[in-house]
A protein has these predicted regions:
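Positively charged, polar, low-complexity stretches
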Residues: 1-100, 119, 135-138
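Glycine-rich, aromatic-bearing surface loops/beta-hairpins
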Residues: 113-141
Length: 141
């Protein structure tokens, strides 16, 4: 069974910049929205630390935040959640595959974007490995 870290938060609706700030940070981490304001990431020391910092920022923004470590118990739930994370990573990698198929791909740009997506690819999806191989081969040419 995997462990997960969950963040539940609430920030004042006005000004909306506070909510947008928190949302952008969660998206940048690759967190998945479970329900309303409950977000989840696979538990690692790094994801836990990032959500601790974000929870502290929520409180500085005059909001409330709660952070949990949890396990999914019912059959199939964990697999479904992992599948959501993998699908999100696959969707982020797709434009990189397209960029590498161009006549003269911008390797620096694709590499930079690859590293950004790779940081959110918590389950090492197949497309990420494929893009890495394509980038490695292109650099050797």
């Amino acid at each position: 069974m995997r462990e997960w870290v969950l963040l539940h938060y609430r920030v004042p609706s006005v000004p909306s910049a506070r909510r947008v700030y928190v949302w952008r940070n969660l998206k940048q981490l690759g967190a998945m929205l479970l329900h309303d304001s409950v977000w989840v990431l696979p538990y690692t020391a790094w994801t836990y630390e990032q959500l601790q910092w974000l929870a502290a920022e929520v409180e500085e923004l005059e909001g409330e935040a709660a952070l949990w470590r949890a396990q999914l118990i019912l059959p199939g739930q964990e697999e479904a959640l992992v599948a959501r994370f993998v699908a999100a990573s696959e969707a982020e990698y797709a434009p990189l595959r397209d960029a590498m198929a161009a006549e003269e791909p911008d390797l620096a740009d694709v590499s930079r974007r690859f590293l950004q997506v790779r940081r959110r690819d918590y389950f090492d999806c197949a497309t990420g490995k494929e893009i890495y191989g394509i980038l490695s081969a292109a650099r050797e040419e």
